[in-house]
A protein has these predicted regions:
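Short hydrophobic targeting helices and cationic amphipathic motifs
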Residues: 2-4, 9
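Extreme N-terminal starter segment of soluble prokaryotic enzymes
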Residues: 14-17
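Short internal beta-strands
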Residues: 44-53
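Ser/Thr/Gly-rich flexible loops in soluble cytosolic domains mediating phosphotransfer, phosphorylation
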Residues: 98, 106-137
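Mid-chain, well-packed structural core segment of small domains
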Residues: 74-110
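Histidine-anchored nucleotide/phosphate-binding helix
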Residues: 29-37
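Short hydrophobic/aromatic-enriched beta-strand-loop microsegments
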Residues: 45, 62-73
């Protein structure tokens, strides 16, 4: 059971985590990253993000590669990295109470995570379980 729950050990090196947060969740994302900075800084983890999330995360002192903003295709860029196997985990703090014009891209990203068996966390509790569970191995 645990083997199915955690990511394959072969992905330990060159870990690429995508981080995305809707506008109403960006502060929560920065707080989450700060709370887990020891894990993120201690391990071989590379962060990528959508554009505006990346700006906020960089201001908080994290090294991140920012892609396009979500509405301009950033979610689709991350989805492509999920599909080609270069992205190992997605942390996406969605705002389920707001409408988003790029909802089809969001749905595509989530679907591709399921298709390619990539862990996807959509809130701080599930993201903490993924990160901490991964590094307990």
């Amino acid at each position: 059971f645990l083997n199915q729950l955690f990511i394959d050990l072969s992905k330990l090196f060159n870990m690429l985590i995508a981080i995305i947060a809707h506008d109403g969740k960006k502060a929560e994302m920065v707080q989450f990253l700060n709370e887990n900075a020891d894990i993120l800084h201690k391990n071989e983890i590379e962060l990528i993000s959508t554009g505006t999330t990346g700006q906020k995360v960089k201001k908080a002192g994290f090294k991140v590669t920012a892609l396009l903003t979500g509405p301009l295709g950033g979610d689709a860029q991350i989805a492509a990295k999920v599909a080609d196997g270069t992205c190992n985990m997605v942390i996406f703090f969605r705002d389920p109470l707001e409408k988003h014009p790029h909802e089809p891209d969001i749905s595509m990203l989530m679907r591709l995570c399921d298709v390619h068996d990539i862990p996807l966390a959509t809130n701080p509790s599930s993201a903490a379980l993924l990160l901490k569970g991964y590094y307990l191995q």
